Every structure is written in C-alpha cells, then in structure tokens.
C-alpha cells in the first residue's frame, strides 16, 4: 500500500504534534530576536553618518546574499573550530553550545533580521516628508519625531510585509532539522528513516505547517485591520445623498 490513512492518523500525527512546540519556539524566539536586531540595523542603514550607513548596508547585503543553510552550517559546524575546546566543555555556556537548537535560533535570527531591517528601512522612507517637517515645526526633537511620527507610521506600513516574513520564517525552521533539531520536519524525517514510509510523514508535516500558517495569518490580519481602523471612514453624507438621487428608484413616480 502506497498511502495508509490509519498509519498517518495513529502513528505519524501524534509524533508530529508533539514536535509542534519546538517549531513554535524556533519561530517565536527567532522572530522576536530578529525584530530587536532589525530595528537598529534599519536606523543605521539610513543614518547620516556615512561609515555607519555603509557598514550596515554591507552587512545587510552579506546576510541577504548568502543562503540560510550556509549560515546555519557555519555556526553549527564552524563555531567549535574557533573557540577553545576546553571553553566549550567547561564554561557555563557549554549546555547551550552543545544544543543545536540555539545554533538554529542564532542563524534564523541573524538571517531574518536582515530582511526585517530592509522592510523597516523601506517603511521609514515611505513616511511622508510633510509629516516629519510638521513635527519639527511643532518643536519636536529628532527623537520625538522618530518616536511619535516616524515609528508608528512605519510600523503600520511595514505590517503586511512583516506578516509575510513571519510566514517565511516559520517555513524556514525546517532547515533546523539538518542540524539534528527535532522539530516537525526533523520528526518527519526520523519517521521516514525508521518506517521506510515516505508519504505519510511528509503529508502529515505539510498539514501541520498549513495549519500553523493559518493560525499565524488570521491574528495578523486582525491586527492589521485594528491598526488601520482609523483609515476606514463612513462615506460623507453629501456623497450618500448624491448616490440616492442618482439611483433609478429616486426618479420613479409615486404610487
């Protein structure tokens, strides 16, 4: 039999669902870290100081120009070649340095921060110059303009793109399975090797990721609607009157 639904439901899905917390932890922790790293990178990429600006842009180009898998392998397999072996074995950080989960977190965070910074940089550039000039005209400092005008407007502009990046980040966590992290994809690969069945583990993993993406998209859409709620205004009363007069029923003879 090529595909067995009972095997999928009884054997595969319970193990895949048990690995969902690991996938969510990879996504949430690296997503939060990428935002914390991306904000200063975006500000530095648009700074007036030329060395700071070009060094930030060069870093963004380097991270965006290299595959995530290469970055992950450099961290996981190359970090141990740099630091002394005694330090990795005897230091307080040795439990973390031996856990592939944290290497995946660092690689995902650094990689995603470059894309977050690029999105935020474009959103900051999209803030109308008139609003910034108005803030300065009211006597605001550069920090106040950034905090009260540029920041809120840029986040509103960047929210749809950041939602898309969050979905891509969730799907990028499958690469953590290549360094022995047992997330959903790592568990699916283990089941494939142990049972010699291909379709059930992969189909089950696909179903889990589709559900996770849906659970991520729905609250993101509600958040975007909530943030932009003030942009939805009721039609002007005069426009409603014109529409009513232009309708065919308005010219019909009374009974």
Predicted regions and their residues:
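Transmembrane alpha-helices and adjacent helix-loop boundaries
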Residues: 1-255
């Amino acid at each position: 039999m090529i595909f067995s639904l009972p095997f999928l439901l009884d054997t595969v899905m319970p193990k895949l669902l048990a690995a969902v917390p690991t996938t969510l932890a990879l996504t949430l922790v690296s997503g939060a870290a990428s935002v914390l790293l991306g904000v200063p990178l975006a500000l530095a990429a648009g700074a007036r100081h030329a060395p700071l600006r070009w060094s930030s842009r060069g870093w963004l180009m380097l991270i965006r120009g290299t595959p995530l898998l290469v970055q992950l392998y450099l961290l996981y397999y190359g970090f141990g070649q740099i630091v002394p072996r005694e330090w990795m074995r005897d230091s307080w950080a040795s439990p973390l340095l031996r856990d592939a989960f944290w290497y995946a977190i660092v690689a995902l965070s650094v990689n995603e921060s470059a894309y977050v910074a690029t999105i935020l940089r474009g959103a900051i550039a999209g803030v109308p110059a008139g609003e910034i000039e108005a803030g300065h005209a009211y006597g605001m400092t550069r920090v106040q303009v950034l905090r009260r005008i540029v920041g809120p407007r840029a986040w509103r502009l960047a929210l749809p793109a950041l939602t898309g990046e969050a979905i891509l980040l969730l799907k990028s966590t499958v690469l953590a399975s290549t360094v022995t992290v047992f997330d959903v994809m790592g568990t699916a690969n283990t089941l494939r090797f142990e049972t010699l069945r291909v379709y059930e583990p992969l189909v089950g993993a696909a179903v889990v990721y589709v559900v996770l993406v849906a659970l991520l998209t729905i609250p993101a859409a509600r958040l975007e609607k909530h943030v932009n709620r003030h942009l939805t205004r009721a039609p002007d009363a005069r426009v409603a009157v014109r529409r009513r007069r232009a309708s065919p029923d308005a010219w019909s003879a009374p009974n």
